[in-house]
Amino acid sequence: MTTLGTALTPKATKVMMLGSGELGKEVVIELQRLGVEVIAVDRYKNAPAQQVAHRSYTISMLDGEALKALVEKERPDYIVPEVEAIATATLVELEQKGFTVVPTAKATQLTMNREGIRRLAAEELGLPTSNYQFVDNFTDFKSAVENIGIPCVVKPIMSSSGHGQSIIKSFDQIQQAWDYAQQGGRAGAGRVIVEGFVKFDYEITLLTVRHIGGTSFLAPIGHRQQNGDYRESWQPQAMSEIALQKAQQVAEKITSALGGRGIFGVEMFVCGDEVIFNEVSPRPHDTGMVTLISQELSEFALHARAILGLPIPEINLISPAASKAIVVEGKSTQVQFGNLEQVLAEPNTNIRLFGKTEVDGHRRMGVILSRDISVEKALEKAFRAYDKLEINL
């Protein structure tokens, strides 16, 4: 039987979030709805989840000693990684000492870089993937591009939101792609993956929840990427029954291998009735923000329930829905959003502004959420609302 304490009391149930972005912010809110005490950690001050947590700390989460000291100080019941750039060897050590890492320290360690998860998926589990090769110097990189063939996709083994990712369409782009990958890695320059270009009809995220009662799947989410970063997502993505069954089988295999409880974002390419595994994140997924309006329980509420060992008897889709990322370009420490009365005049439409304190280049600062009788109409509505939004730097 699950017992939850009350926040800010001696018997509080405590969760430490490692990473405090917009996805973590929603998880914090859902945990607090259940009376949980939340500590938010990030590498910079006033990150979105820190703004709503009970307490916050600013450290380099790649510093294992600093991370260990903080965990020993707070002694949380659950450690919940929200980003890849964490000293995962320290998480393994903490788990061995009796701390609970969500979903597991192994899952966090394997998925923190693309090499660990790709080798697990393709070489151990035999899941269908694109052709690939890992390299750590420019000479081997050129050879890998020749072996894989053009076009091909280049990614740092450790990055998020499309940073460092590019597509090589001609041989004269090889140096540029290498340099961009070296600049975009979360932990600095280093190893990259060269992937064969996959011909596909569409991409999906199959959110998969491992919980006390078993494994459950959300309705598939379609999405559009730009430079490796999500721009729009919608739910449900129409797909054949055969393709959906195959996608669920792939998701079941990879999440079972990772273990633990919580939500996983399993990314796949779909071509006809065939599915190809791409990546998996052992945490809520950015494309899954659409569930804030499409479902009775969002991916964040489901994650909170799964973490705490609470049941998830069913997952209900309210209606077709879409999300449109608000990406701000420029340089500012005082971004303002205007004309919101017109944005929210669209029925069954909402907006989330993440509270990120600055932008330097381009950054996702919010999301428009819309519901309608079809995915197409929901997308149209989200775009209409977005077009009315005023952004002032």
Curated annotation (Swiss-Prot):
GO biological process: 'de novo' IMP biosynthetic process
Residues the entry annotates as binding Mg(2+): 267, 279
Pathway: Purine metabolism; IMP biosynthesis via de novo pathway; N(2)-formyl-N(1)-(5-phospho-D-ribosyl)glycinamide from N(1)-(5-phospho-D-ribosyl)glycinamide (formate route): step 1/1
EC nos: 6.3.1.21
Name of one Pfam family that matches: PurT_C
Source domain of life: Bacteria
Gene3D superfamilies: 3.40.50.20, ATP-grasp fold, A domain (3.30.1490.20), ATP-grasp fold, B domain (3.30.470.20)
Annotated ranges, domain ATP-grasp: 119-308
Residues reported in the UniProt entry to bind N(1)-(5-phospho-beta-D-ribosyl)glycinamide: 22-23, 82, 286, 356, 363-364
Keywords for this protein: ATP-binding, Ligase, Magnesium, Metal-binding, Nucleotide-binding, Purine biosynthesis
GO terms, molecular function: ATP binding; magnesium ion binding; phosphoribosylglycinamide formyltransferase 2 activity; phosphoribosylglycinamide formyltransferase activity
Catalytic activity: N(1)-(5-phospho-beta-D-ribosyl)glycinamide + formate + ATP = N(2)-formyl-N(1)-(5-phospho-beta-D-ribosyl)glycinamide + ADP + phosphate + H(+)
Alphabetical list of InterPro entries matching this protein: ATP-grasp, ATP-grasp_carboxylate-amine, ATP_grasp_subdomain_1, PreATP-grasp_dom_sf, PurT, PurT/PurK_preATP-grasp, PurT_C
Binding residue positions for ATP: 114, 155, 160-165, 195-198, 203
Record carries keyword Lyase: no
One CC-aspect GO term: cytosol
Claim: Nucleotide-binding is one of the keywords in the record: yes
Role of this protein: Involved in the de novo purine biosynthesis. Catalyzes the transfer of formate to 5-phospho-ribosyl-glycinamide (GAR), producing 5-phospho-ribosyl-N-formylglycinamide (FGAR). Formate is provided by PurU via hydrolysis of 10-formyl-tetrahydrofolate.
Family the UniProt entry places it in: Belongs to the PurK/PurT family.
Subunit comment: Homodimer.
Protein name, UniProt field: Formate-dependent phosphoribosylglycinamide formyltransferase
Organism for this UniProt entry: Mannheimia succiniciproducens (strain KCTC 0769BP / MBEL55E)
Lineage: Bacteria, Pseudomonadati, Pseudomonadota, Gammaproteobacteria, Pasteurellales
